[in-house]
Amino acid sequence: MAVLINAKMDALLESTSRSFYPTLKYLPKKIRGQIGLLYLLARVADTIADSKEGETSELMKILTQYNEVAQGKSDLLPDFTGLAEIQDNPAEGELLLNVQDVIDSLEEYTVPDRERILECLDVIIGGQILDLERFGVAKEGGEISALNSN
């Protein structure tokens, strides 16, 4: 497939999305890169939210900080080194170590495209934060998390 975003992002996209990446060729060429970048941005958030270690409040803080940087509201990107080291999937660890490059790739697109991508990302991260609030950190061994009764 031709370059979607740029060589580095394409490699991250291919390594983190084995089943999604091949389907991009079926989308119109005009939007493949934007959809691919949104996938990477969302995958960063998903990797943070699904981390099996750390306190719920800390993961929510990291998600919020990540979103604020992606949305252009802050320049203080969290240090993802610790989270990257605990990932079972090495490609997800590599993605976390390259978050700034993923965010910087937004500049490849027009302002309206960036706005749409970031609007979608904001909704996705909002849902992930809500899941963390309701269910807490992902648990090993298929343990079920109960909802609060209120």
Predicted features, each with a name:
Residues 1-150:
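Acidic catalytic motifs of isoprenoid enzymes
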